[in-house]
Curated annotation (Swiss-Prot):
Assembly with partners or alone: Consists of a catalytic RNA component (M1 or rnpB) and a protein subunit.
Protein name: Ribonuclease P protein component
Catalytic activity of the protein: Endonucleolytic cleavage of RNA, removing 5'-extranucleotides from tRNA precursor
Keyword terms: Endonuclease, Hydrolase, Nuclease, RNA-binding, tRNA processing
A GO CC annotation given for this chain: ribonuclease P complex
Pfam families recorded: Ribonuclease_P
């Protein structure tokens, strides 16, 4: 059985980690969010989140968005390639229901998985 935790090793923690992803990344986007991906040297994917106040105004809104993205990543982590992912929220992301956001994330995870596998 696969372990479905979201431990510290599955997160991008330092500004250098984020900088690497922003420099050369595959991009999958929608009007609501963008996911950047770049291969890493580890044997597992890692997740970073960028949710600007300018895009989602309230702290509960930003926290809700991050919680949903982390949960989607946690459930999909074993299907994802060994990439560093950064999810960037756009203004309209706060208007999506949980179900719509999960479906959108699934679609984008799948698209990035195909891109990185060739």
């Amino acid at each position: 059985m696969n372990k479905l935790a979201f431990s510290r090793e599955l997160r991008l923690l330092t500004p250098e980690h984020y900088k690497k992803v922003f420099q050369q990344a595959h991009r999958a986007g929608s009007p609501h969010l963008t996911i950047l991906a770049r291969p890493n040297d580890l044997n597992h994917p890692r997740l970073g989140l960028a949710v600007p106040k300018k895009q989602i105004k309230t702290a509960p809104g930003r926290n809700h968005f991050k919680r949903i993205v982390r949960e989607s990543f946690r459930l999909k982590q074993h299907d994802l390639p060994a990439n560093d992912f950064v999810v960037i929220a756009k203004k309209s992301a706060s208007e999506l229901s949980n179900e719509e956001l999960f479906k959108l994330l699934d679609k984008l995870w799948h698209r990035l998985s195909r891109l990185s596998r060739g």
